Each structure stands twice: as C-alpha cells, then as structure tokens.
C-alpha cells in the first residue's frame, strides 16, 4: 500500500469532458422512451395550472437562433413551473398558411394558375407539414420538452373550425364589414397586407412641386391664381380629386417678379419655397386662413374632365412641402377620409400588379407605377415648379422586401373602432414585464385603423361569407357555424371542392336570392387572423390548458403581430385579453451588434452550435444575456459561455467525487452539529436557492445565471472548496469533520442539480444518474428545492462576512510575502496575526481552524504589540515568515512534528494519528515507496 492510498481522493466516473454533441441525443431518446413529459404531467395533475401559450413560428425552413432563444426561454419557464408545484403542459404550435409557402412552390416550378386549386392547396399542405416535421426535430434537439406528438397546427380541421367560430362571433356582433377603403397593397404579392406585414426602409423617391389653376375662386381667388402642391407619389396625380389645406394654417397669395401668375402657398414656407423655385422679389398680395379657401375649385393639371376641390384636413402640416397636399382618395387613408367627407370620387388608377390602368389616361396605361415620373413631368409642363429626389422612410412588404402602395379595393375589415376602448381597458389589466411594452401595445391599439382581414391569395382559411343574387353579403350565425362544422369534418379545402349551395345548411333561403342561387367569397383570411385565433383553437379547446393563458412570450416585433391580433379577436369574442402576462424579447444580433443576414454571412445556425458545443451551451447562453433587449451571439461568445459551463460542470464533478462514499441516510450530520463554516455555507446556499426560485418565478434568467456563477466561483471555488481538500482528503474517511463537510457537499449537489434542471436538463440528468440514493429516476420528476432558514442565521452571516474581510487582508499579507520570496505557496507560511479586540472576538466566533481556512501551515494569534514590519490594517496586522518544520508527505503542510515513522512514512503527528487509527495493516507492514 502506498501512502497516497490513505488519502480520501475523490472517485467518480463522471467525466470532466461533457461530450454534449454526442450525449445529448442519447439523453433525449431516453426521455422520449420513458415518456418523461407525460409522466411529469401525470405527476402534477390536480395542482394549480400554469399555461404558457406557444406563439406559432412559421413552418418554413430550419429554425434560426431567434427561434432557439425563444423556445429555450419558454422551456426554462415551463420546466421551472412544473418543478415548482404547477400543472404546466406545453403545447407547441405552427403557423402554416400564407404567401411564403406559395412562393416556395413557385420557385419549385409549381404554376398555381395552371392547375386545379384543390391540388395546389394539397401541395401547400404537404409542404407545410414537411416543414413542421423539420422544425419539430430542430426544437427537440434543443432539449425542449412538450407534447410534440400532439402539437397545434393552423391547417388542421379542428383549428380551422375554431378560427371560423372566432370570425363568426365577430360577425354576429357587427364587427365585420366590407368597404373599399385604401389598404396597404403589395403589388409584388398581389394582395392586401395588414399593418403587421409591413416593415419600413429608406426609399429614394422623386418629389414634385406643381400648381393647379383656380377654376372657381368663390370670390376669394382670381382665375389667374395657382395653388402650389407637393407630392412624393407622382403616379397618384392621375387619381387626384382635391387639394387639402389646414383650416388654421395661414396661406399667402404671392407674385414673384417677372411672373404673370399668382400663387398660393403656406406663409410659413414662403421663404424656403421661393429659394427652391428661384423666385425673386416676391410680393405678398394677400393672406388667408385655410378655412377661407374651402370649396374653391381648381382644374386638374392635365385632365380637363376633372375638377379638384379645395377641402380642409387635420393631417396637413407645414413641416414640409407647400402646406397644401393633393388628395387622391383611392391612394391614401387620410385622402380617403377627407375625400369621403367631401364626396370626392374614389378613383383607383393602378391595378393589383402595380400597372397603370386605362382610367389613368392613354399616356399612362400599361406603365409600372414607379416608372411614370417622366410622363407626369411631361404632362405637367409649365405647371411643374420644381422636382427633387428625397430619401424617406417608406413601407415595404415584409416578405418580398418590395415597396407597397395604398390602394382602395373592396376588402373585408374587422372593426377595431367599435370596441377599441374595451381593448385598451384590457391592456391595463395585463402584467407587462417591461413598461415600454405596455405603452407600445397601448399606443398601437389606440392609433391603429380597422383591420383588413381579406387576402387575395389561395393558401389560407377561406372567409365564410356567401353572396345572394342581389349581391347582399351573407354571414349569419347559422351559415358560419355550418361552415365551421364542415371544416371540422373535412378541412377548409372543402370550400373549394363544393359549390356555394352545397356549403350552406340544407334548406337555407335568403330574400336576396329568390331563385335560390348563391356565390361564395374567394378571398382568404389574413394569416394574422389564423395565429390570432390560437387562444380559441388551442387554449380554449385543449382541456389541459386554461384561458386566458398565464403568459405569452415572443419577440418584441409581436406587439404589432401576434400580441395585437390575439388581443383584438379575444376581446371581440369574450371581452378579455387572451393573456395575463406578456414577456417580450429582443433580437439576436451578431457579435458586433449587427443584424444577422444570410447575405452578410453572419448568421449562426442552432445546428452548428449543437455540433460544436452542444445545445446546453445555447441554453446557458440564453440565461447569460438580458433578452428583454437585443442580444449578441457569436461562436466566440458561445466559447466564453462554454468555459462557464466547464467551470460549473467541474465544480459539481468535485462534489460528486467527494461524496462517493457518503450515504445521506446514514452519514448526514444535523445542522446544529455542523461547524460554523459549514453552517455559513449552508446559509449562503439557501440564499442562492431563494434567489433562483424567485428569479424563476419572475422569468429573470440573467439573475439566475449571475447568482449561480457567483456562488460557484466565489463561495465554492474561491473559498469553501479551496480549503476543502485539507478536510475531505486528509481526515479519516468517517471522521466527524469530513462528514460535516460532505453533508454540505451533498446538500448543495442534490439541490443545485435540481435548480439547474430547467436550464441544463441534459447535464442535470447526467449528474442525477450518479446520485444513487435519490428516489426519482429522473431529476426532471423532482421538485425545485425550497430555501431553508436557520437559527441565528443573520448572526452567522455577519460573522462570516467580517471573516471574509479579514481573510482578504490576510491574503494581501501572504501575497506581499510571496512577492518578497519569503514563501512560495501559502502552505509554506507561518502567519502571525496582531488583532484588536474586534478581530480577536471575530476569530473566536468563527470557532474553526483558521490556519486551515487560510491554507497556511501555521497561524499564531499574537498578544504582543504589532511590529513595525507588519502589514497593518485598521483592526489587524500581519507578519509572514516561513513555517518551521518539514513538509508532511501526506497533507503537504509544513509541521514541526513531521518525521519519518517506523512504517516508512514522513508525516506529521496529525496524519500519523489518522493513518495509525485507520490503516493498521499498512502500518504493520510498512508503506511502499512513493
């Protein structure tokens, strides 16, 4: 036997290297085979419910890192709730209708307009489901736990039927109407868009300043007067039917030198416009209030058949332009509103593809709307006063990345104005985890217009509307519920497979159809109505969930998307918000803080992270950032997170190894019998437990990460475990001092493993597999630990906080001695302490082997005065010299009692007593050489 064999060196097969990329899939298969998700739900039956409703990602392509961050965050929350006494099932979902899938099929050579619609929709469905399968595997690879066998998918018959019923209730309440209002129109998608489908980019446009000649001045203006107009959309002049002025804006009638014509512009803009137009010596002839110009009639710049009426509008400002805007009711919301109020014609001169139509005039017909500027300039002739290129923020189709236009076309709308105040009242009841989120959603609802819900596409849920022979739209409870039942049984494709009469209830009649003939709507619903109905299709309809949901958690872009549409439909149907809390996240940016994009080559695929680091590192990264704001991610950042993971893993490995001979049922030492330092560490750990439990409850992942890393680095590695080897390795295997420390080790190990489970489930399960005395076969079936409080807790904490200050001062003294070459390692030191009464009392209260805590071989508490050479602090001073004696081959301390024993061992008296008591045979035979 060798002397080193008398040491209690930690033993474990728990590997230092995690091997996450290969081990994680093995664990995941084991969880699936064991039906772990189902077992957890069964275990929590009857407990308080917690419903985190999954916002459905769009089923197209592999997941990106933003998806991963979001789903991991949800998984951490659901797992922590499940381990905190809540019944918290998780139903993942997918959004599957819409233009992107049509675009994919088009790129694959599928020609929608050349094939049977039902066959085309079948191809869309097959593709969507293939993408669901792909993303399902992506999410499962992240270790996300949920009912993957029974997700919700927006194309399933039961979901589509639930969506129809949401629409039906809104129709019954009078919230659905048809109108020809201007809507966001995407010529690149050939469809109307909702606000949520718009994104803004800078666009360079040609702006024109031109003049309309007065035709009837109403006794205010002469007919040789021209009203100056500004536009950034020259194509809309073809549909201009009025000029709008601000009622309270001052306008001036002016005549520049050398100019026979007189012009009207906003007084405030005269100076800048004169410079722009090259006017000199401008004479102001008259000043008018805008309301005085109301109902003056002007000529259209070139269309003699059209008159343009001067009208009043609150949207007119003097921030730019001329203070007068031309008004084309068919091409703008403000234009439409003031145009309708003044009985102006709603002319639309651009078709669904962005091509100018016949009513624009023969010179324009057939041209793309963006290309007509030269023709407009030619038609304006000497009415054009100036042109310039401007860069401004402009709406784009978020899918095709092409600019859009406002265009008045017959569309179906969901009224928001009819119940806007109800929605705003409900927002006040929702808990937002960021105040700016509440303000953002509130302002969006307050300021938004009615919701255009119809789309001129194929792949989506049909609007369940019929038309009578006289054109009357039919959407009554009887017909809508019948359609819902048909969809529930056959899916929405039946809408296209059957004639209108076969989609109506048997024997249905309508006074507008004396001959019993009906037509059906061919538009589909906005996909935001699809996902915005999920509270009904999933939360209400799945018995394991509760409505309203406890939490919606998505990216901050969903304030205008899913948060918004879900809120509108839920309040419209039931008068309540669909969620009790909203938690939003920022976007994942690259390591430099730049937006990720394939074209820039700065994207990070979750699959690449899994191959290089493992999903655990991605999961740990999610907790290491403040995801309420935009966050950065790169392979370098993940490498740093991987180092943190390694530190956590190896610290827990040390605890596993040094409790391998510890049976908690037999060897646990009661708290009251622990040493003061062990009590202190127990209290500190319970503070960590409380911090983490509270942070899980508040979804504060970064708090968990910081607290955990700080505890492992500062409390454990830099202190408790730093001197632990002097106890757990050196003392007798069954000694009280060793069992005291092992009691703390084991308590921390078991509980910290549970605390880590929501974040690092693979690692937690691997650790758990080494804890043979724990009852649950999987740590995921256990509960998060509760924080315990102890007697005299504050007193103990105060004592050890003071000791930590003392320790820091002692370490400075040792460092100075090391720099002066007095000692090398701290174990070579004899530290003499010159305390005042406060420190003397402190060291007595610590009631521990202070030399052991400071990792020095000898420590003396001096009574004599402090020598001049001492390193002095306010309450204490230190001197350091080399310890007397020789190095003990067993404990490595320098000790005066170190000597060669008769059993061939050079050890100190303390080690000799341990060896002689516990290894009698080896003592009798003598130890082998090193």
Curated annotation (Swiss-Prot):
Amino acids binding L-isoleucyl-5'-AMP: 554
Catalytic reaction annotation: tRNA(Ile) + L-isoleucine + ATP = L-isoleucyl-tRNA(Ile) + AMP + diphosphate
Pfam family, one: zf-FPG_IleRS
Cofactor(s) it depends on: Zn(2+)
Coiled-coil annotated spans: none
Entry note: cofactor: Binds 1 zinc ion per subunit.
A Gene Ontology molecular function term of the record: aminoacyl-tRNA deacylase activity
Location (main, coarse): cytoplasm
Family annotation (InterPro entries): aa-tRNA-synth_I_CS, aa-tRNA-synth_Ia, Anticodon_Ile_BEm, Ile-tRNA-ligase, Ile-tRNA-ligase_type1, Ile-tRNA_ligase, M/V/L/I-tRNA-synth_anticd-bd, Rossmann-like_a/b/a_fold
Residues at which ATP binds: 598
Motif position, 'HIGH' region: 57-67
GO cellular component, one term: cytosol
Binding site for Zn(2+): 888, 891, 908, 911
PROSITE patterns: AA_TRNA_LIGASE_I
SUPFAM superfamilies: Anticodon-binding domain of a subclass of class I aminoacyl-tRNA synthetases, Nucleotidylyl transferase, ValRS/IleRS/LeuRS editing domain
Subcellular location: Cytoplasm
BP term (GO), one: isoleucyl-tRNA aminoacylation
Subunit structure comment from the entry: Monomer.
Protein role: Catalyzes the attachment of isoleucine to tRNA(Ile). As IleRS can inadvertently accommodate and process structurally similar amino acids such as valine, to avoid such errors it has two additional distinct tRNA(Ile)-dependent editing activities. One activity is designated as 'pretransfer' editing and involves the hydrolysis of activated Val-AMP. The other activity is designated 'posttransfer' editing and involves deacylation of mischarged Val-tRNA(Ile).
Domain-related comment: IleRS has two distinct active sites: one for aminoacylation and one for editing. The misactivated valine is translocated from the active site to the editing site, which sterically excludes the correctly activated isoleucine. The single editing site contains two valyl binding pockets, one specific for each substrate (Val-AMP or Val-tRNA(Ile)).
Record-stated family: Belongs to the class-I aminoacyl-tRNA synthetase family. IleS type 1 subfamily.
PANTHER family, alphabetized: ISOLEUCINE--TRNA LIGASE, MITOCHONDRIAL (PTHR42765:SF1), SOLEUCYL-TRNA SYNTHETASE (PTHR42765)
Name of the protein described by the UniProt record: Isoleucine--tRNA ligase
Organism name: Streptococcus pneumoniae (strain Taiwan19F-14)
Gene that encodes the chain: ileS
